[in-house]
Curated annotation (Swiss-Prot):
Mg(2+) binds at E124, E127, H128, H177. Its main location: nucleus. One of its GO terms (biological process) is programmed DNA elimination. Its cofactor is Mg(2+). It comes from Tetrahymena thermophila (strain SB210). The lineage of its organism: Eukaryota, Sar, Alveolata, Ciliophora, Intramacronucleata. The gene is HEN1. This is Small RNA 2'-O-methyltransferase. Interacts with TWI1.
Length: 423
């Protein structure tokens, strides 16, 4: 409803829309609070998860929504790694797991409580509930799940004067909204939550300023950030909570590509030595047509990134040990060899006879297998294909589908989701 007014109403020098501002605020705040495990209640099309996944701090991002079909289509599409995420793999040194669940935010679900989230986020969700259901989501969120932090965003009805709703006979910004709070109503609700559940407000703010009048009528979207107050918690009694037990269906689990510190280090070693060998002028030529580039340990030690970043200044034994440890990895069908004080890169001659061609093909397959072992950190997370999508079931029928996403080798290809996806 408000999209038609964005150009005329909102002030933003770089042209960000209000929903983008909300996501930007949430991502920035979660980063400042050092949250690693978060739940997005009412995740919808998973646009917020897409934004959060670009941060390297998170280890788990879960999304919950009542609309399973939406999660299976747009949700999965937005939550899976894109080209940016695959480029991030070399910077992400821990696994990021994204889980999408179909279920109600009004029911208590032990599986979600067991995740021990650092933060739970409600972005433009609460206004879609019936007024009587607000109390239920309060109980579930602040009484049952009890994360350390809670972020809630909702429309500010005071700001609606700029939308000319009366002339159009419109009451709320969206036809599915059951109510919209004024700034005063929102603050009163936040205060009651703190009193009833042992939380405190650490920030009350918003996003979306009017183009000419600024925050005269507040922000377009109002935001509150709660933090659990451990001093009050021991005096609270949650026995009166009568939430119904609920069930959830896990729509998918997505494992983001990452590179452990050891893998990252080994790759840097290989890349640095290959570069040094590539630019060296020293070369041996053999009768069979093969040739060999080589360099000395002292030449490698002179490389600034090796001596500084690897903390091995002058320690030739340590450098030799590193090189020996990585000598098993083959790169571009050529092998590193370590002999005495020299490091060499061997290039095989062109093979003409059929026997040698078969041997070369076999060697090439071995090379590919070893490269896969090097670049893919976990067989359960990665495969030689970009994506494998399969359906399965368990005894408790909790898990229905699973996505295993691997690191891309070239560029992403556009695909359509089917029962089985392989690309």
């Amino acid at each position: 409803m408000i999209e038609a007014y964005e150009t005329d109403v909102f002030m933003d020098p770089i042209g960000m829309k209000v929903w983008e501002k909300r996501h930007q605020y949430v991502a920035t705040k979660l980063s400042a609070l050092n949250c690693k495990r978060v739940l997005d209640m009412g995740t919808n099309t998973c646009k917020l998860i897409q934004r959060l996944s670009r941060s390297l701090q998170f280890t788990q991002i879960d999304g919950l929504d009542i609309d399973g079909q939406l999660l299976e289509t747009q949700g999965i599409q937005n939550a899976k790694p894109d080209l940016i995420q695959n480029q991030y793999a070399s910077m992400r040194d821990h696994q990021l797991v994204v889980n999408l669940y179909q279920g109600s935010a009004l029911n208590k679900i032990q599986h979600l409580k067991d995740q021990q989230y650092d933060a739970v986020i409600l972005v433009e969700l609460i206004e879609h509930l019936q007024v009587e259901d607000v109390f239920l989501i309060e109980q579930n969120l602040f009484g049952f799940l009890r994360p350390q932090f809670v972020i809630v965003t909702t429309p500010n009805s005071d700001f609606n004067v700029y939308f000319n709703f009366k002339e159009q006979g419109v009451l709320f910004r969206d036809k599915d909204h059951k109510f919209e709070w004024s700034q005063n109503q929102f603050q009163i609700w936040a205060q009651k939550v703190c009193q009833n559940y042992g939380y405190k407000v650490i920030e009350l703010t918003g996003v979306g300023e009017h183009k000419t009048e600024g925050t005269k009528n507040g922000f377009c979207t109002q935001i509150v950030v709660f933090e659990k107050d451990t001093q009050q918690e021991k005096y609270l009694n949650f026995a009166f909570f009568n939430l119904q037990e609920g069930e959830i269906r896990q729509v998918c689990q997505i494992l983001y590509p990452f590179e452990s510190k050891e893998q990252h280090f080994q790759r840097e070693v290989v890349d640095s030595i290959r570069y040094i060998l590539h630019i060296t002028d020293k070369q041996n030529q053999f009768e069979d047509g093969s040739y060999q580039n080589y360099t000395t340990l002292s030449r490698i030690m002179q490389n600034h990134s090796i001596s500084s970043n690897w903390q091995i200044q002058g320690d030739y034994f340590k450098l030799k040990t590193y090189i020996q440890n990585i000598s098993e990895f083959l790169v571009h069908e050529n092998q590193f060899n370590f002999q005495e004080s020299f490091v060499t890169l061997n290039y095989q001659a062109q093979m003409e006879d059929e026997e040698n061609e078969d041997q070369l093909e076999s060697d090439s397959e071995n090379v590919k297998m070893q490269q896969q072992q090097y670049y893919f950190s976990n067989d359960n997370c990665f495969s030689t294909k970009d994506t494998t999508y399969s359906s399965f079931s368990t005894a408790d029928n909790l898990f229905s589908q699973k996505i295993q996403l691997g690191q891309q080798q070239m560029a992403l290809e556009e695909i359509e989701l089917e029962d089985t996806i392989d690309y």
